[in-house]
Amino acid sequence: TVAPQAALSDVLFLLNRYQLSRLPVTDGQKLVGIITRTDIIRVEADQLGGVCQLPQRSTPSYVVYQTRSPAVGTGRILLPIANPDTATALFKIAAAVARERNYEIDCLYVITVPRLSSPAEVRVDTREGRKLLHRLERLARQQNISVHTQISVVQDIADGILATIRERHSNLLIMGWTGEKSTTGAIFGFSVDTLIAEAPCETILVKLGTKDCFPNDLNRERIWLIPTAGGPNAQRALALLPSLLSLSESSDHPELWLCKIYSPTELLPDLSTLEVLQASLQKAIAQPVVPLPIRSASPAEAVINLVESEDCSLVLLGASRESLLNQLLNGNIPSTIARAVNCTVILVRGELSD
C-alpha cells in the first residue's frame, strides 16, 4: 500500500518491483482509493501535453490546535461542534454510529475571522474550544472510541469544513442545526445549505429537540417516527437505525412507527411498498415495527400533526440532496417538519455520486 502523500516515482517503483498493476492508497487502516499504471501514464501525458489542472478554490484556513488518537478505524466521522449545550448530545449520536461502523471521530471546532484577515496571522482565543474538545475526549475514552480533535481558524465555516473532509477523507459528516429560519433565503442556513450541496460524503443533519427527546429520552416511553416514500432515500435513514437503537437497552427500545403518506385521491392505495419495507426493517433490527399508512394532501402537515398528537421523541428522514435543497410549492418538506416540531429530527443525505 501507499499513503496519499506518496510521490508518483515511489508508486511506480513499487509497481515495477512487485510486478503489480495497481496499488491500494490507504490513510492508516482506511482505504481511500486505488492507483494504477494507467493513472500514472495519464498524469505524465497531461504534463507532456501541457495540460494544467487548476487547483480547487479554497478559503484559507489555519490549524492552531490538534490532537491525534490511534488510527484504528475503517472510516472517519467529521463532527463540527460549536455549542457546549448541544455538543454532548451530538457526540452521543456520533459515538453510536462510530461503534456500529468501526469508525473514528474527528471533532472540529472552527473560529471565524474576517475575509480580509489571514487566518495564519490573527491572534485567536482557543480556550473555549479546547475546553469543549477536552470534554468530548473524556467521553470518548469512557466509550473506548478513537477521537481526534482540531481547532481551525477559517474565513468561512462551510469552506473550512469541506477542506477538513478532503484532508481527513471523511466518510460521514454529522452536524447540528438550530432549526431557526434563515433570513437570507437559504433553506437551512447558508453554511448548512453549502455543506448539503457540496459535502461528498454521507451527511446527517441533526436538529435536537427538548431535554426529553432523543438522545436524552431514555427514561420515558417513546415513539420514533420514520416517514418514508420508499426508494434509496428511505434506506439511508433506515440504515442508521441500528446505531441509534444501540443508545438504549434492548429491553427498553422505543416504539418504531414507519409511516407513508398517500394522496386522498387514491381510492385503493398500494401498501405493498410499506409492507415490504416494514418486513425488511423488522428482520434487520429484530424488533417490531408498526406500519402506518396515512391519507393527506400535505405530507409535512401530516407528519407534524402525528408528532404533536403522539408526543414522538424522534423523527428520522432520508432525503437526497435535491429534495433537501429544492424549494417545493409548499416549501421544503424536511425543513418544514424540522422547524415545526419540538422533538429531535435527523435528516440523512447519502454520499454524492460522481
Residue ranges and their predicted role:
Residues V2-Q19, T26, P84-D85:
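The conserved cystathionine-beta-synthase
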Residues D27-K30, T36-K92, A96, V110-P114, ...:
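Intrinsically disordered or low-complexity boundary/linker segments at protein termini
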Residues R76-Q142, S146, V154:
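Non-catalytic interaction/regulatory modules that flank or connect domains
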Residues Y109-K131, S251, W257-L277:
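Acidic, proline/glycine-rich short linear motifs
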Residues I151-G160, R295-A300:
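Charged docking surfaces used in two-component/phosphorelay signaling
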Residues F188-S191, T273-E275, L329-P334:
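Charged helix-capping and loop-helix junction motifs
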Residues S272-A279, R295-D311:
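A short, acidic, amphipathic alpha-helical segment used as a generic capping/interface helix at domain edges
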